């Protein structure tokens, strides 16, 4: 059986490989090449070297979007994972209605980002309207609006991952710790957290990448207003590419830089948390 699988593996893998090459590899390579070109369409691309990259770092809107995105990512990763872990701990204590609460917390994750953005825009503007403010009055309003939206959407999904991990902790291990006189805090710090570190790695990776590449919620909630001060990187790239004639190459260069930043941060985070797993 194993020999037959090895024999026909290339036949079954080839369609997937071809689709992956056409749908990802070729566009990715073309995107890198176009980041060194001036163009309005891919057929009139003119190579200009590093000019586009120099224009990227001289563009104040990009640098502001980078710092805004970095701050948003830090806050959202921390809040989402803390809330998700706390809720998961509560829902694994055997309280009544656990399945109902799991469903309720998970449901927002099923709603599309653009829809969520408009829903929360209406809700938050309705609340702020009582104080003569809107989400676009200040970038800080937009920032915390995005944090609330992202938490509401993502906490339920991360909660499910944490619940599965907590339920897999051997009961004998917890009982042994209690018999040794471990307090609730010691039990959490020395048993629960080390045992769920693989889930912490996964959830941190997912929230980090989702936060950094956030686009549709940003577009729907604030559209970068006021004056692009609540604009995140993905939206900045979109508006550079499609909203500024002659800047298509710069937009592509921004996209390449964006990819590198996300890849480096995600790999570093993944390696760091996996190291913690080994140490534990």
Regions from the PLM with identified roles:
Residues 2-280:
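A structural signal for multi-pass alpha-helical bundles of membrane permease subunits
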């Amino acid at each position: 059986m194993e020999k037959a699988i090895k024999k026909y593996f290339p036949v079954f893998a080839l369609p997937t490989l071809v689709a992956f090459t056409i749908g990802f590899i070729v566009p990715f390579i073309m995107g890198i090449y176009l980041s060194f070109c001036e163009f309005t369409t891919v057929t009139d691309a003119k190579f200009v070297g590093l000019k586009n990259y120099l224009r990227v770092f001289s563009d104040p809107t990009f640098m502001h979007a980078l710092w805004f995105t970095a701050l948003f990512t830090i806050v959202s990763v921390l809040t989402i994972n803390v809330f998700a872990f706390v809720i998961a701990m509560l829902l694994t204590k055997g309280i009544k209605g656990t399945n109902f609460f799991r469903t309720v917390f998970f449901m927002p994750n099923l709603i599309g980002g653009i829809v969520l953005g408009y829903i929360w825009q209406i809700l938050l503007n309705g609340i702020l309207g009582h104080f003569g403010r809107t989400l676009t009055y200040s970038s800080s309003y937009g920032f915390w609006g995005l944090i609330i939206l992202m938490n509401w959407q993502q906490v339920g999904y991360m909660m499910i991952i944490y619940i599965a991990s907590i339920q897999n902790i051997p009961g004998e291990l917890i009982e042994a710790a209690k018999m040794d006189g471990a307090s609730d805090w010691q039990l959490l710090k020395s048993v629960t957290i080390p045992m769920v570190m693989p889930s912490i790695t996964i959830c941190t990776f997912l929230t980090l990448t989702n936060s950094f590449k956030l686009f549709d919620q940003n577009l729907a909630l604030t559209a970068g207003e006021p004056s692009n001060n609540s604009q995140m990187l993905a939206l900045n790239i979109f508006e550079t590419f499609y909203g500024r004639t002659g800047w298509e190459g710069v937009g592509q260069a921004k996209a390449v830089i964006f990819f590198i930043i996300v890849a480096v941060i995600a790999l570093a985070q993944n390696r760091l948390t996996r190291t913690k797993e080994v140490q534990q």
